[in-house]
Regions:
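N-terminal catalytic or cofactor-binding beta/alpha core of small enzyme domains
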Residues: 1-75, 84-90
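Anionic group-transfer/hydrolysis microenvironments
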Residues: 81
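A short, glycine/acidic-enriched catalytic loop
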Residues: 86-123
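Long, well-ordered alpha-helical scaffolding segments within enzyme catalytic domains
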Residues: 24-31, 120-138
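Short, intrinsically disordered/low-complexity patches at protein termini
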Residues: 66, 139-140
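Active-site-adjacent mobile loop/cap segments within catalytic or ligand-binding domains
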Residues: 142-145
Length: 145
C-alpha cells in the first residue's frame, strides 16, 4: 500500500496491495471483457506474493486447485501477474496503431521446477494458438516464456 515514503507511479516496479493500482484492476477489465463475450468468469483476487514473494507460485497453484475443485467444468484458468521489470533495457510494451500497450506474456509451467503440472503441454498448445491469433492482429503483442 502506498505510504508517505512511497507513492505509486505507473512506471514503478514495486508491488501494492491497493486494488486500484494492482494487477487485480487489470483482472477486473479482463473479466468484464470475457463476460461481454459470454464467458462465465470467476475473478479471484487472492494475493499470492504478499507479504513474501518466495513461495507465491505454490500458493497460486493452491488457489487454482481450489477453483478447479469447486468448479470442475472450468475451461480456462488465467493466473494474471504484473511482473515488475526493473531492467530498463527491456521494454515490455508494443505500439498498436497510435497506442502503446503493455505486452502480454504467457509463462507455461512444466514439471521441471518441482511442482506438478500434468497438463502443461495442453496449456502450451492453447497459449500458442492464442499467441498466433494475437500476433495476426497485433504483431509482437504476445510472447511465450
Amino acid at each position: 500500500t502506498p505510504t508517505e515514503a512511497f507513492s505509486y507511479e505507473e512506471s514503478g516496479t514495486f508491488r501494492t496491495t491497493d486494488l486500484n493500482y494492482s494487477v487485480s484492476r487489470v483482472g477486473d477489465s479482463l473479466s468484464e471483457q470475457l463476460t461481454s463475450y459470454g464467458f462465465n468468469v470467476t475473478h479471484d483476487k487472492t494475493y499470492h506474493d504478499y507479504p513474501a514473494y518466495s513461495g507465491s507460485y505454490g500458493r497460486s497453484m493452491s488457489t487454482v486447485q481450489g477453483i478447479l475443485n469447486n468448479q470442475p467444468n472450468s475451461d480456462i484458468i488465467i493466473d494474471l501477474h504484473r511482473d515488475a521489470i526493473a531492467d530498463t533495457s527491456y521494454a515490455p510494451s508494443v505500439q498498436i496503431g497510435d497506442e502503446i500497450a503493455s505486452q502480454l506474456m504467457f509463462v507455461i509451467g512444466t514439471d521441471g521446477g518441482g511442482l506438478e503440472h500434468p497438463n502443461w503441454q495442453q496449456n502450451l498448445k492453447f497459449a500458442i494458438s492464442i499467441q498466433k491469433k494475437a500476433n495476426e492482429l497485433y504483431q509482437g503483442y504476445l510472447d511465450l516464456f
